[in-house]
Structures are given as C-alpha cells and as structure tokens.
Amino acid sequence: MAVARLAAVAAWVPCRSWGWAAVPFGPHRGLSVLLARIPQRAPRWLPACRQKTSLSFLNRPDLPNLAYKKLKGKSPGIIFIPGYLSYMNGTKALAIEEFCKSLGHACIRFDYSGVGSSDGNSEESTLGKWRKDVLSIIDDLADGPQILVGSSLGGWLMLHAAIARPEKVVALIGVATAADTLVTKFNQLPVELKKEVEMKGVWSMPSKYSEEGVYNVQYSFIKEAEHHCLLHSPIPVNCPIRLLHGMKDDIVPWHTSMQVADRVLSTDVDVILRKHSDHRMREKADIQLLVYTIDDLIDKLSTIVN
C-alpha cells in the first residue's frame, strides 16, 4: 500500500527556483511528512533549477585521474555511482545533487576511469578498476558518513564499497541493482555464441538504451567481473538498504533486487517495486521516489545519531 501511495503522489521536494512555497522541514524530515504535503502547483522540471558545480579532477598516482563534481554540505553526504559506461550528468545524478543542495547536504558525482571526462581507455576498463574508482572517491573526497546511491551496475559496486568501507558507508540505495547481472546474462548464452564472443573479444549485447542498439562489452570485462560476483554467498553488509526496481526492467530482472535483499546480512532492507517503470527509472515519479527515499534515510540516520 505504501508503494502505491508513493507512486501516486505528484509532489516534489523543491529547490528555491521552482517557485514553490518553502517546505518547512523539522528536525525529522521523514517520508511521511513529505507525503502529507500537497504542492500549490506542479514544479518545473529539473533543468529549470540547475545551478552548475565546477568540474574537478582527482589525481591518483599510477591510476587514471577521475572527473568529479562535489557539492559541499553537511553529513551524511550522498555519492552517486553510475551504471555501465554512464556519465555523471544523467537525470538521476543531477536530481540528487539538486535535492542535496536544497537540504544543505554534501553530494559527489563522478565518471569512472575511461568514461566521460575521466582519464583512461574504456576498452581497458574492468569492474575491479571501477571498484577502485569508487573507493578512491570515498577515501579521498568524501568527508564523514556517506549514503551511496548505485544505479544498475553502480548498485553492484555500491555493495562492494559497503563491504570495503563499513565505517564510512552508512546506507545504500540501489536503483535497478545489477549485482552479478552481466556475468549471469553472459553465462546464459548458447555455448556457440559464448565461444564466438571469446574469439572476437567483444560481446555485442543488444540494448534499446544504446544509440547503436548494442553495448559492446569487452570479453575481458566479463571474465574479470566473475571475480566480483556476490550472490553466491551471504553479503556482509549491515547498514540500512533500500532497493528500487521497475517491474518493466528488461535488462536487470527485478528478482535480482530480491536476491540482494535475501543475501545481505542487514535486517533493515526494503525492496520497492514500481509496476510500470523500466530499467532506467528516470521518469518524474521514479525520481520523486528516489529523492523521497534519500530524505527518509537521512532522517532515519539523524534519529539514530541523536
């Protein structure tokens, strides 16, 4: 019932330039408070209220420099971890940054090595290298406790980050979490096709989200990713976890989020399914649910600290 109510609400937590009346957040801005508020008028969409943050680079000895944008603010901070070959300037990343700005919380978004504005060669990318990228962002840029928001493959990496940095990662939000998915999908291919991919060195994976109609995934990326699979055993993550997934997702089955929920050791886990959402989950209602979830976790963590 709660999920259906969320999906039906048209409200949005405003930034000032949207022209809403100010929403007075008390010491505990819970999700129930947000849902109880009715907007005076529908907001203009995200681009109307964007305020640019400058592009910076994290210099790393012997590793590619990472492009990032950091919004300073209070804790917990939010780090957005993008999907496969996705950039930091996607709809979800920008919406999260704007939401954090409205609350005064810190936010970091970045490009993986070999992707977007970061240094490196995408054909040499591996999941292990991107895992190091995420840990570099957490270790070198993030101050204090962090909530990680992982989209698709970024959801897989957020779990690894939570395992590696339990003292700093205090909550997780997965959007179409693609834990093990690339390896699982490859292993489901016919034997003949897998041999062909091995010979060519590239898997042309069909995708309606690519302009070319396929994602060209390096065979080396798939084989290296096998070393990072998580769903075969309990996942040692104990922080609060929220997993959002669209039931129309034809890339990562929503059952994957159920598997993650079952495998993690945390007892504070919610899986929220949206009946008509697809893999990208970037429609207005999807973004609303995402920022509501972030706000509720911030409220929950503040309550625990206090």
Curated annotation (Swiss-Prot):
Transit peptide: 1-52
Pfam families for this protein: Abhydrolase_1
Enzyme class: hydrolase
GO cellular component: cytosol; mitochondrial matrix; mitochondrion
InterPro entries named among the record's database cross-references: AB_hydrolase_1 (IPR000073), AB_hydrolase_fold (IPR029058), ABHD10_acyl-thioesterase (IPR052382)
Family statement drawn from the similarity comment of this UniProt entry: Belongs to the AB hydrolase superfamily.
Protein name per UniProt: Palmitoyl-protein thioesterase ABHD10, mitochondrial
Source species: Homo sapiens (Human)
